[in-house]
Amino acid sequence: MAGQQKSVTLRFLAAPMDANVRGYVGGGKILEWIDKAGYAAAAAWSGHYSVTGYVGNIHLHRVVNVGDMVEVEARVVYTGRTSLQVVCTVTSHNPRDQVRVTNTQCLLVFVAMDSDGKPTPVPPFEPEDDWEREENERAQVLTAVRREVDDAMALQVYSEATETCRETLRFLAAPTDVNWGGKVHGGYVMHWIMTAGKLVAERYFHGHARATYAGGFRFYRPMYIGDIVEVDARLIYTEGPEMHVSVYVRSGDPRGTELQTTTHCTIVYTARDEEDGEVPVRPWVPRLPEDRALERHAVDLIEIRSRLGRNEPHEPHAD
């Protein structure tokens, strides 16, 4: 029954096929898990199919190792008229020692849809304990911050007038990428974004880079099976060991000529040495006007997000 179940927990072992080329489970796969758990919680509370609108403020604290027992807990913390905000917490442990670590925590926004694909009202959520009250209040603060970030993003130009390190992936959305609504799964889109961003970071650094923060995946429109997909990633800012990479996803009918923007995110990667310690990267010094504007934009986003005031997870039932 809608409005009754407010949390869902997925439990499973991280499999060898989940690992990246470095042998551990990277941020892209973790985001796939998060999107699935978040969808389950949103659908259970709303009683409707729900689409991902936003996934953000993602601090990737620790990697998941192959063979770890993984728990992805998704909890509804706030509702609007047709939207739901869900906090997802990912923890993992080696089954042989039971020492649990928190890998990441983030906020997702879903919109409930009726049978005609239109937004539909959801049952109101009322927090019942200290953790829920704090997350409910924080969700409202994050909504205001997202609007400020959206306004800043709308002013930026991404064209061919650039000298930065840039990579573009192109492929067709396959039937295996489908979600429960017949469109491309948002978790897979996030995985593609993380892959393209990592490619740019490692090409620029000429070494290993790990995703440590994602500033917000914004989903503007759905993507369909059979669409041609273009994932365009470019470096926009460096500081110390950090490389800030902006990624746009566009898609469209391969028989047509125009691709439409479906998703955008900015990801922070850190350069790592052979012992997995952080090392500085050579500074990116932009010369062209567009590149300089995007560098200023990255600095502005850092300032806006600094007001969020929390980098560590706030685990459920920790109070």
Residue spans for each PLM region:
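Hydrophobic beta-strand-centered segment that forms part of the acyl-chain substrate-binding groove
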Residues: 2-5, 25, 38-85, 91, ...
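Catalytic strand-loop segment that frames the active site of acyl-thioester-processing enzymes
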Residues: 1-26, 125, 139-192, 199-200, ...
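Hydrophobic, helix-prone linear segments
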Residues: 1-73, 99, 177, 283-287, ...
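Hydrophobic face of alpha-helices
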Residues: 31-35, 190, 194, 244
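HotDog/MaoC-like acyl-thioester-processing domains
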Residues: 3-10, 64-66, 77-147, 225, ...
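Generic structural detector for well-ordered beta-strands
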Residues: 11-14, 59, 109, 170-172, ...
